Amino acid sequence: MDKKNVMRIETEDKHDISQQKHASLNVQSGRKEEAPSHRQLAGPPAIIIFISLLVACTLLSFTLGRYPVALKELLAILGNKIFGLFKNSEKFWTDQMEAAVWNVRLPRVILSVLVGACLSAAGASYQGVFQNPMASPDILGASAGAGFGAALAIFLDFKHVNITLCAFAMSLLTVALVFRISRYVKGGKVLGLVLAGIMVSSLFNAGTSFLKLVADPNNKLPQITYWLMGSLAGAKWSDIRFVVFPMLAGLIPLLLLRWRLNVITMGDEEAKAMGVDAGRIRIAVIISATLVTASAVSVSGVIGWVGLVIPHMMRRIVGSSYRWLMPVSMLGGGIFLLMVDNISRNVTTAGIPIGILTAFVGAPFFLLLITGRGERY
């Protein structure tokens, strides 16, 4: 067994010991520690199940819509476009059907999965780094910055691609400003980041409100409002090409650092005893989570609750170890947002903004947590 595997095993063992200590402290302090009322799945079976669900939901998403597409026709169109099949044979599908699948539904499905995976991964990462179960992807102001950038671009009458670019750039600049301000905040580094994030978010939200106030009420204001509610209705291949590399650049480090996240959740002293530089790992995780959040929000608008709700749901399924929690959260987030988007585009002709639908799910779950009837993490 090599050194890397030994390190991973020690991390998992230490994480279990830390959870036992936490339970013991709860008993000593008089708090009642109840055993989980459900049975958790092992990591590998859970991943297999969620991958299967993702494939099934993806195929289902292609067949749903005002222009019906059968599974046989769907597979034929994808095979023809991707692998060049059926080129020498007569098509049994129409050009309109091919355009609907390839130019409209496929970009939207891919973007739904990517955005859901990114928001869930970012939420799980922030909850571990800040050791706060209520942490979400917008804790450092990434969403507020992206909203201001998009509103400014719409106000200045920029094109679709430039709106996405402005939202992405402003999101990263906002978090950079939060890091800068946090250096001057008295207290710990984590507390400084959270307080600076609250202040900067409030500042950029005020800027967005001002732009809405002075925007043209007949043209610009509805466009800004709709963007801020979150939607994937205008998903294009250019959006995917723009965000796929930043998303991968953030998701891959989060997957590679998920064992170290277990160490960070034990506290800095435990991490130092195990030879882990908690400060550097924390910064690396925050930067990666911010990158995927900025990428997701820049193409989808502000979609709340996904990064808060999905990690908690996945903890009930696979436990709190980031070895399995991180990949399962990514899969669960992709499935969740994909199904919500299916509802969004099929309930009404115009489509319901995704942010509204995710709030209908997230708000009751949040209520369950704060009333103490849900499982505490």
Task: Name the predicted role of every residue range.
Residues 2-377:
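Alpha-helical transmembrane segments in inner-membrane proteins
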